[in-house]
Amino acid sequence: MPTLDSLVCPKCHGPLTAHAGRELRCTRDGVRYPVVDGIPSFIIPGPDPVALPGCALSLVLPALNEGENLDRVLPELKQALVALGPTYEIIVVDGGSRDGTQEIVRKHGARLVSQKLPGFGGAYRAGFEQARGEYVITLDADGSHDPKFLKDLWAARRDGDVVIASRYVQGGAAEMPATRRVMSRILNTTFGRGLSLPVHDLSSGYRLYRSAILRELELKATDFDVLEEILIRVLAAGYRVHEVPFRYRARVSGRSHARLVRFAISYLRTFVAMWRLRNSIASSDYDGRAYDSVIPLQRYWQRGRYRAITQLASGSHDVLDVGCGSSRIIGAIPGMIGLDIQLHKLRYARRYGNALVHGSIFELPFANGSFDCVICSEVVEHIPALEKPFDELARVLKTGGRLILGTPDYDRWRWRALEWLYGRLSPGGYADEHITHYTRANLGPYLQGKGFAIEGVEYVGGSEMIFSLKKLGPMVSPVSARSVQTAHRADRAAPAA
């Protein structure tokens, strides 16, 4: 978390105090701001009274005619949980068993939940809805997941938002028929490489989750593909996934309920849907992954922007990146603070090791003159042409400090052509959210009127302009934001050259 010396209430600029590590409070008017996943948020409403979980851990076991296995597995689970120590509940989600599963579950004191939606995915959703624990562990009811491994998952709960018992990391193994092993490897390779996922075992059902995360997910999959969907949606939301080595053993009795044709169709459907998500700007790591994109133009653009901005910011001590997203720029300078309005992008950016703030360019939660360098790249074109954002950027910058401001130059035919082309070739990766079209001719004089001296303007791809500006002091702008907005409307109406 950034130091309280730099953070202030965005409403009144009053000082803040920390309370129990979960919120900040304004000392002037008592406004409360939550700390979410270690990130101070000035967007999310102040925290409500904490709703305590019903227990520390919920175990969720989907079951369909697994009575014989459950009669052996449930006592082993209870024994392992008692030795582990946390308060717990065991939930068995029954998909309409006809082998006495219900009686066996009641005999061993577990909670029985009747499945309403079809398939393995429906069982998961039913279990997640009923789970009362702070953490949830899912495992199979057929005995293939060793209850003794619960302690390993529980011990790793602080290492990730999701912890996977992984067969495919060093130290893991899988005892299964050769055909099934080959299919599992093909499945994991297809999803892992096809979707650029930083996970080795995507199909393991033996996992630990923070239950708060599960409540955020809008799951669609109905079969075993729900396992991949959960992980991909978790990663898209910026959460961390951790794997611990696990030795998988074959089911003790009975037969698998997977059906090959239905299995293949459901996985194909989920792969297509998740490919669209992974390659859209909605994915938390979109900015970061673009740096290494397989698309040459995207890779060139990201690296050109990174190089230009980091060179301009080098040597600065107190740096703020407004609208940092998940770009690698936030990790380029030690001690830099990143601010963005999208919390899931900030969750991903935690890996860069710098301080992060969930806030808005319209109300920056920092004291006047806090920074000797402020970066604002690819932001102002997404918001109306108003005075407030530019005033805020100037306010938090020290006199003599540098503002690095990047935005497309809509006077350049290259940008208009690229925007048109990219929007059609990769509609998921480009959102037509540019509501203000700036040009060098209208933005330069406006910034000078705001008290900035233009030190230079660099271009990425001959069309994205990056201003290097020195703050001289406050001035009354002869060019108003309204006139810039009028100019950009005229630009939008003009045909591309």
Language-model features: locations:
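Conserved N-terminal segment of class I S-adenosyl-L-methionine
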Residues: 1-10, 21-51, 275-367, 373, ...
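N-proximal low-complexity "stem/linker" segments adjacent to membrane-targeting elements
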Residues: 41-76
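Hydrophobic helical membrane-anchoring modules
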Residues: 48-57, 194-197, 219-296, 403, ...
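Short, acidic, metal-binding catalytic loop of nucleotide-sugar glycosyltransferases
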Residues: 76-86
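A conserved acidic beta->alpha catalytic loop
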Residues: 94-102
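Acceptor/aglycone-binding surface of glycosyltransferases and processive sugar-polymer synthases
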Residues: 115-130, 135-138, 144-224, 251-261, ...
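A short beta-strand submotif of the Rossmann-like class I SAM-dependent methyltransferase core
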Residues: 376-379
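A short glycine-rich, Lys/Arg-flanked "PGG" loop and its adjoining helix->strand segment in the class I
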Residues: 387-399
